[in-house]
Curated annotation (Swiss-Prot):
Entry EC number(s): 4.2.1.182
Protein name (Swiss-Prot/TrEMBL): Phosphomevalonate dehydratase small subunit
Keyword Membrane: no
Annotated signal sequence range: none
UniProt keyword list: Isoprene biosynthesis, Lyase
Source species of the chain: Methanosarcina mazei (strain ATCC BAA-159 / DSM 3647 / Goe1 / Go1 / JCM 11833 / OCM 88) (Methanosarcina frisia)
Species classification: Archaea, Methanobacteriati, Methanobacteriota, Stenosarchaea group, Methanomicrobia
Length: 144
């Protein structure tokens, strides 16, 4: 059954493969993520205490200040950024952050990612061609 591909919309070009980390909560990169370590520091966030470094980060959309784009860039410079991002629908703050940081980003998948992805899955995000590919299923639970 694996691999499985789903088409989406390209926001930021490039390709990256990595382990999925899912949040149903929006993310504000300014104040919610430590730009030195990539650890989510927002206490009430579903990913509090977890690192986004090197992960394929799945979240619905961004929130908060426009400075969040530059925090994403700082994460990349500090080698603490996610490998790639999948959004339900990307807003401008996350789009700009991904583009200037060269983080592949795809949104608006033809199937809701929360229905088929779970923490620990291995996914390829192809931002250049606008698709994601589920390569390996992990041991985690789907986030419904």
């Amino acid at each position: 059954m694996i691999p499985i591909k789903f088409k989406g919309r390209t926001i930021s070009r490039g390709c990256a493969e990595g382990e999925v980390l899912i949040s149903r909560d929006p993310i504000s990169f300014l104040g919610s993520v430590d730009p030195r370590t990539g650890i989510v520091v927002e206490e009430k966030h579903s990913l509090a205490g977890k690192s986004i470094k090197g992960k394929v980060l799945v979240f619905p959309h961004g929130k908060g200040s426009t400075v969040g784009s530059y925090v994403m860039y700082q994460l990349k410079k500090n080698e603490a950024a996610p490998a790639a991002i999948i959004n339900l629908e990307t807003e401008p703050i996350v789009a700009v952050g991904a583009i200037i940081s060269e983080i592949p980003l795809v949104d608006m998948l033809e199937k809701d990612p929360y229905e088929f992805l779970k923490d620990g899955d291995t996914v390829l995000v192809n931002g250049s061609e606008g698709y994601i590919e589920l390569l390996k299923q992990g041991e985690g639970q789907a986030k419904k």
